[in-house]
């Protein structure tokens, strides 16, 4: 059985009236697939997504059917698919990456220093790096193909972009994307903080089901799609340590002559961070 689509870090298989999404142990940074594999990374992403999908059903339904390979075709009942595979409903995915920022960091901080704005949104003066924002902000982007970069767009541009694909529904869909993104972030960020983790920012993706209703797709609040910081020791004014692939990003930035290969020590520390965030948030250990 071959995947119908292979993303940077995921393979998607057609299962008739459903899809099976396999989160691989590949790692990508700056939209480039690195040469390393990070053992258990795919399992963390799948199981953490399941955790959040279960928690947020009161806000919006999601595409998850099962993460148990026993519910999947025989092909997936192999050890390499156990734990990192999710059977999902088929959706018509919306062409927007829904980014929400609760703290100012990364590209948002760089933009704010230059212009006082992030993705066209004016922020208060005098913010320091890693400061909590007065309210979370929604900063959508377009979806890039492999090898390209996502492009930040304004809310108004997101309406026009959606209108091209869904004539007559651009404004309605853009508003639903924004409102659901903020609602999901607020609920999950509050929970995570109670477990000792700050969700600085994250990305959601949504699709429409067969009745045209909005559904959460892709993965949700994983170390691949989010910036997780330890709440203990949080101090604005500089970058924060993190539980996500920022560790790998930082090494690549500090070593520009790399050939997109991380030292084993960085790989080991990266998976340690992934596992630690999973255990803190869910209260469970991965087998």
Describe each model-derived feature in a short phrase.
Residues 1-145, 258-287:
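Active-site loop/lid in soluble adenylation, ligation, and acyl-transfer enzymes
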Residues 18, 93-95, 195-199, 211-214:
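Coil-to-beta-strand transition motifs
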Residues 30, 109-110, 211, 225-227:
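Intrinsically disordered, low-complexity acidic/polar segments
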Residues 100, 199-220:
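Conserved metal-phosphate-binding beta-hairpin within the catalytic cores
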Residues 114-117, 123-172, 216, 220-281:
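Anionic ligand-binding catalytic core segments
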Residues 168-200:
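A long amphipathic alpha-helix within ATP-dependent nucleotide-binding catalytic cores
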């Amino acid at each position: 059985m071959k995947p119908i689509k292979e993303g940077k870090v995921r393979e998607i298989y057609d299962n008739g009236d459903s899809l099976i999404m396999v989160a691989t142990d590949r790692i990508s940074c700056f939209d480039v697939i690195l040469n390393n594999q990070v053992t258990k990374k795919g399992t963390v992403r799948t199981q953490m997504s399941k955790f959040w999908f279960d928690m947020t059903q009161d806000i919006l339904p999601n595409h998850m059917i099962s993460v148990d390979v026993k519910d999947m075709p025989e092909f997936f009942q192999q050890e390499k698919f156990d734990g990192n595979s999710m059977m999902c409903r088929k959706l018509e995915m919306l062409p927007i990456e829904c980014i929400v920022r609760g703290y100012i960091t990364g590209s948002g901080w760089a933009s704010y220093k230059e212009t006082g704005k992030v993705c066209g949104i004016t922020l208060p003066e005098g913010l320091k790096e890693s400061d909590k924002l007065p309210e979370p902000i929604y900063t959508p982007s377009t979806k890039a193909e492999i090898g390209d970069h996502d492009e930040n767009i304004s809310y108004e541009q997101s309406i026009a972009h959606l209108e091209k694909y869904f004539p007559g529904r651009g404004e309605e869909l853009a508003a639903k994307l924004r409102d659901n993104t903020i609602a999901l972030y607020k609920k999950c960020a509050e929970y995570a903080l109670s477990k000792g983790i700050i969700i600085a920012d994250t990305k959601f993706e949504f699709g429409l089901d067969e009745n045209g209703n909005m559904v959460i797709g892709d993965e949700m609040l994983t170390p691949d799609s989010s910036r997780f910081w330890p709440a203990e020791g949080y101090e604005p004014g500089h970058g924060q340590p993190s539980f996500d692939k920022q560790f790998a990003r930082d090494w690549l930035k500090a070593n520009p002559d790399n050939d997109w290969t991380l030292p084993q020590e960085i790989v080991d520390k990266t998976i340690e961070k992934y596992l630690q965030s999973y255990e803190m948030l869910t209260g469970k250990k991965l087998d």
